[in-house]
Design a protein with these regions (language model features):
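DPxDG-like acidic metal-binding loop motif
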Residues: 67-98
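Phosphate-handling active-site elements
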Residues: 56-63, 91-101
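N-terminal phosphate-binding loop and adjacent alpha-helix
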Residues: 35-56
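Phosphate-coordination loops involved in phosphoryl transfer and adenosine-cofactor binding
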Residues: 3, 65-68
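Glycine/charged-rich beta-loop-alpha catalytic/anionic-binding loops adjacent to active sites
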Residues: 27-36, 67-70
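Short glycine/serine- and small hydrophobic-enriched flexible loop segments
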Residues: 52-53, 88, 92, 183, ...
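Phosphate/pyrophosphate-binding loops at sites that engage ATP/ADP/AMP, CoA/4′-phosphopantetheine
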Residues: 51-66, 136, 157-164
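Oxyanion-binding and handling regions
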Residues: 1-29, 40-46, 99-225
Length: 225
């Protein structure tokens, strides 16, 4: 079944990515370079031109798109917000639906994986990681439980207990990539579109600035005022 043209974005890491997908085939893709000073690569002035370049590479106009899919996190607070803002803007500007997908799922989905259990991880700072378990069988990827925050030094034990292979950018072997949307597009469509006005990324934890503010003031930021 044809699914038309999909624009996919992910900003869960500082190496943000974009892909244009026709049905289930990636026809163009781009990725920002991950840099030592993360604030520089997640900014809109870098991400938006990458989106435009990717559309141009695929010879696709925004008006040709059937939908936009955005990685929902967890991950980098700033980069997730940038990608989400761009995705929402394109959806509103073109009148197409917005869908969301787990960025941890995109780690597994970006390449063909052997059948079995996989524990996908992303850095969560403070010597912790975001982690979620997935099963792969005949190229079908399924979630096995929700995303969690684990301590880095518990990862090997956690994976061994689950009989899973570790994969993810905290280990330097994979990052989420928007191209992974092609492998899981059917599940994304089945999950339903997002309400553009209310949808926000799943950051996984409070922003570092908010943590510091609450520690200094002894109360939640939401209680300020």
């Amino acid at each position: 079944m044809s699914t038309g043209l999909t624009l996919a974005l992910d900003g869960s890491t500082y190496a943000g990515s974009v892909a244009v997908i026709r049905d289930r085939d990636v026809i163009a893709e781009r990725q920002l370079a991950s840099v030592p000073h993360p604030g520089k690569s997640g900014k809109a002035e870098n991400f938006m031109p990458m989106v435009a370049e990717c559309l141009r590479d695929g010879q696709v106009r925004p008006s040709d798109l059937a939908r936009v899919v955005c990685g929902e996190g967890p991950g980098s607070f700033t980069s997730l917000r940038v990608a989400a803002s761009i995705a929402k803007g394109i959806a509103v500007g073109t009148g197409i639906p917005l869908y969301a997908v787990s960025s941890l799922l995109l780690i597994v989905a970006r390449e063909l994986r052997d059948d079995g259990m996989w524990l996908a991880v992303l850095p969560a700072m403070r010597e912790e990681v975001f982690a979620q378990q997935f099963s792969v069988e005949r190229h079908v990827i399924r979630e096995v439980g929700p995303a969690r925050i684990l301590r880095e030094h518990d990862l090997e034990q956690e994976a061994a207990h689950a009989g899973a292979s570790l994969i993810g950018s905290s280990r330097g072997d994979a990052t989420p990539h928007a191209r992974g949307v092609a492998a899981v597009i059917d599940g994304i469509l089945a999950s339903g579109r997002c309400d553009i006005d209310s949808w926000e990324p799943v950051y996984g934890r409070l922003a570092e600035a908010q943590v510091k503010w609450e520690a200094a003031h002894g109360r939640p930021l939401s209680a300020a005022g």
